[in-house]
Amino acid sequence: MIVRYDFSKMVMADDMEGLERNFNDLNRSPVEIMVTHNRDLFKDFQFSSKKEASKMLEEALGYAREHGLPKVYVLIDEYDNFTNQLLTAYKDPLYEQVTTKDSVLRTFFKVIKAGIGEGSIRTCFCTGVLPVTMDDLTSGYNIAEILTLHPRFLDMLGFTYEEASAYLRYVLDKYGTGQDSFEEL
């Protein structure tokens, strides 16, 4: 069974309440789709509420575990998209709220961590741009392995050294002081 989330579709908001609402609006349907596509396995399963995406995932995983259903593969595309938008918009306090304590995002990843630990999730594969968000979430989600740091994946995930160097040289020539600061950067 597969549940696929796409955080690139996350609609931004100026406060935590708006972000939570938008996060839940976006992420309730993927788990509901997984249940619908596997209705033969989920039989009489019903969500107790369809308000919180994390609670819905938790309930579906609990049912899967209790009834010996196949393990779930969780795919999250651009897991850091909206948090990166907060950082680039200089909304650091809001970013802090999203990635700390019992925020909607942190709770979501805690549910995934519990699902892996309890055996209802086989694997969670996340794609993203920067490891910043994952670093800030790791105390609650400390079961992640960042594949881009493995040499065998360098050409597959992210930029190669040569690609990054070429782009940096281009930016320095076009917008900076030339190649003088290349080695420093």
Locate predicted features.
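P-loop NTPase nucleotide-binding core
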Residues: 1-72
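A short beta-strand-to-loop transition that corresponds to the Sensor-1 phosphate-sensing loop
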Residues: 8, 77-78, 107-108, 112, ...
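Switch/connector loops and helix/strand junctions flanking conserved nucleotide-binding motifs
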Residues: 11-17, 82-84, 133-139
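Short, glycine/acidic-rich hinge or "gate" loops at secondary-structure transitions
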Residues: 39-51, 73-76, 118-129, 178-185
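Substrate-engagement module of ASCE P-loop NTPases
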Residues: 59-65, 94-122
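Conserved P-loop NTPase "ATPase switch" module shared by AAA+ and STAND
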Residues: 68-98
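Amphipathic alpha-helical segments of the small helical/lid subdomains adjacent to P-loop NTPase cores
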Residues: 133-140, 147-185
